[in-house]
């Protein structure tokens, strides 16, 4: 499955909500969180997601009212 990284503001999400998202099963758009990296001091959140396509990532965020600053398809060395 393709992998994506995106960035957006952390607020209004809480650390508890991030943990729930990290452990959540695949959503209705086919998206799962591989990792969530954040900085509370800079109010910045980076999501590493597995998703069928960029549109699924957009819908995943739109559902909770978040618009990412960017979404990029990425590869890993693993």
Q: What are the language-model segments listed below?
A:
Residues 49-55:
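Helix N-cap motif at beta-to-alpha junctions
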Residues 29, 64-67:
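Short, structured coil segments at secondary-structure junctions
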Residues 30-37, 70:
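A short linear hydrophobic-aromatic micro-motif
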Residues 1-27, 39, 43, 54, ...:
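Short S/T/G/P-rich N-terminal loop/turn motif that feeds into the first structured element of a domain
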Residues 66-78:
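Conserved short beta-strand edge segments in small beta-sheet-based binding/regulatory domains
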């Amino acid at each position: 499955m393709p992998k994506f990284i995106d960035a957006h503001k952390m607020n209004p999400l809480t650390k508890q909500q991030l943990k729930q998202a990290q452990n959540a099963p695949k959503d209705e758009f086919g998206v799962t969180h591989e990792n969530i990296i954040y900085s509370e001091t800079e109010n910045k959140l980076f999501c590493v997601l597995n998703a069928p396509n960029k549109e699924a990532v957009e819908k995943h965020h739109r559902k909770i009212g978040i618009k990412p600053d960017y979404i990029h398809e990425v590869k890993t060395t693993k």
